Amino acid sequence: METRIELKQGWKILQDVHDTGEKTGLYAAREADTSVGSQVSEWEELEELKHLQLIYARQPYFGRELRYFNQAPWWYKTEFEVPDQKVTDAVLKFTNVDYYGKVWINGEFLGEHEGYSAPFSFNVKDKLVFGEKNYLIVKVSSPWDDEVELDAQDSRTTLVKRNMVKGTYEHSDTFIQRDVNPVGIYGKVELILTEEGVLEDQTDLKYELDPDVRKADVYVETEARGLKSGETYDFNVKIREKESGLIKAEKTVQIMAEKAETGFKCELKVEDVRLWSTWDHGYPWMYQAELTLSRGKDILSSRTTNFAFRDIQIERNEKITRFWLNNRKLYIRGTSYFPDCYISAMT
């Protein structure tokens, strides 16, 4: 069984204008910073987790004043209590931190991460204080890139040396805004507590279509943690048509756990598959893989992942490069479109 505690409310924030927070110990487990002379701002209440420009800027899409959001790092703090319970595993998970992030819990450094749309997590079972207050501190920054290739300042837009994998041009994912460089925590921050047995969020699903693309062999692989060594667990996989809910295949694999973290694999055969296609060539048929981990009659954990069957080929020679989707020619149109330069404004 697992319990998810979403750390959504109660966040506080400050901007570390001199970038001295690590030296002065802003990550320490304490209720308030009472130091004098550091010129560090007071903690302010943060109403929600999203890009900071969307919260604090009067006009978040243009203007020189936006540059101050990236001149110095930001520190986030929240406090939470964890029920006094017996757990086999505890994971702290972030879905989005834009862009560089360092994380501390109860004054202890957990690690760091870079990348704004890649979830990351830490095992914190031995770091939590059960039944008492816990302190989570995160340092976040998305600095400007200053160096330009060959010092060609008149071509800065295309020749700036990129230290971050973000933005089609300099820092923006849409139009070319000189002063927009999104920064902040958004999405979900959650603590996942496991009493016994939990499936990882990430599922590795692959398939092979037969020559007439009417049947498919589906291969599902995932990891489970928090298992009890020597116990027997059932790993069940159902493949459904997403639109109708019809079960197309089902299989259960039984395994005896040798350690707390164990991998599960399952192979299924699906008949009469419906192929995903673009709107102008057919219909985007979707499927769902439902994964369930149980011990005896007790369901411990479940996950669902969406996927589609399709056959993609590429034809390439000296004269042409051509794509085929489900045995039909496909013309690849534009990509990399974002309706907003702040991803947190789209969710």
Q: Which residues does each predicted region cover?
A:
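Extended carbohydrate-recognition surfaces in non-catalytic/accessory domains of CAZymes
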Residues: 1-93, 165-187, 194-195, 317
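An acidic-aromatic loop/edge-strand motif
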Residues: 7, 17, 46-52, 62-65, ...
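Aromatic-lined ligand-binding clefts that engage carbohydrates, nucleic acids, or primary amines
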Residues: 69-72, 80-106, 136-138, 233-236
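Beta-strand-rich binding/interaction modules
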Residues: 105, 215-255
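Beta-strand-rich ligand-recognition modules
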Residues: 105-155, 256-278, 343, 347
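Conserved, mostly hydrophobic/aromatic
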Residues: 107, 189, 287, 327
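Short, aromatic- and glycine-rich surface loops/edge beta-strands on solvent-exposed regions
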Residues: 135-138, 283-295
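N-terminal carbohydrate-binding accessory modules
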Residues: 290-347
